[in-house]
Amino acid sequence: MRVLVIADSWLPIPPIKYGGTERIVHLLCQGLKQRGHTVHLMAGEGSMSYGGRLVIHKAPTLAYPSRAFRKLWFQWLSLTVLPDVDVVVNFGRVDYLEFILKTSIPAICRFANPIHQHEIDFLLDRRKGKCLDFIGISKCQVKHLDYSELFTIIYNGVDLNHFDFVKEPVRPPSYLVFLGRLTRNKGVDTAISVAQGAGIPLKIAGNLPENEGDRHFFETAIKPKLGYGCEWIGPVDDRQKNELLGHALALLFPIRWNEPFGIVMIESLACGTPVIATHCASTPEIIDHGKTGFLCDSVNDMIKAAKNLHTINRLNCRIAVETSFSADTMIEKYLESISKYSN
């Protein structure tokens, strides 16, 4: 089939370092190409081609004229590709589909962020009964929506070839790891409290926030605590991530928001490293409490979990990813949705 995949333009496909959704787009495009499909991609500068057409589009600034122009420009770009397309898979903004929804080409809209009802209403209003499918990445992401029954849930996956299973981390000193944006929502301050309470060193990997509020949080709540058994090593690439996760005692995932799916959790499990996570949002769908990690309701619960990591068989973590969260499993489920529209 001829598949057009649309991604936001903020980061290239594949991403260089940070970029969860962009990594999923890359895995899907790569998997479709390997299975003999023609893959066209509309994405940001620096993106690679997957054999079909590569169409570069740019993110707008906040100024209204820029947003209006970029929207029109995107519609024109999509028009140049559509004659060679059997189905569209959109990973980006809902309004990318505005022109496409006026055609007879089937569209699949995959959501990465929390979903607002008005987005679904917008799509259904413009599609008017034509071929339109929705993909969510966790049950918790869609349960509050009208028409939630229209969603297919496809969990994110990881390429197991990029993550080495470590049966037992033996490189001293032992440490916990936090990997993600250094924001309050991600709970990096909680991770520090857990590590200090458990008496275990913490390695923090992630991007320094850019907006003023998150930068203030970093300067006041995180930076003063660095150096006391807590080391911030900055953003990491795939090789460094594999090493960092694989030799950690556990990944700390103390989120404070309804994150639809934290890809870093399955990256950690792929290495055999259990996850200590807040019991909220999608974490119960990913972590098997007591088997592949611990679901916790407080800092004290997380400290206790960090002291009981010896009860986790790391092989169970790897098996969980091989069974439910591999790239191949994910790609085959996307193909089930895409193949409905084969001629």
Label every PLM stretch briefly:
Residues H279-G290, F294-L295:
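Short acidic/histidine- and often glycine-rich active-site loop of Leloir-type glycosyltransferases
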Residues D133-I135, S148-I154, V158-A205:
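Conserved donor-binding/catalytic core segment of Leloir-type glycosyltransferases
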Residues W10-P12, L27-P65, E210:
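N-terminal strand-loop element at the rim of the active site
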Residues A270, P274-A277:
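Short hydrophobic beta-strand element within catalytic cores of glycosyltransferases
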Residues N90-D95, F111:
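Short His-centered aromatic/hydrophobic patch
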Residues N300-N343:
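A charged, aromatic-enriched C-terminal amphipathic alpha-helix characteristic of glycosyltransferases
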Residues G206, F218-R239:
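Nucleotide-activated donor-binding/catalytic signature segment of Leloir-type glycosyltransferases, i.e.
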Residues G246-P260, T273:
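Acidic donor-binding loop of glycosyltransferase active sites
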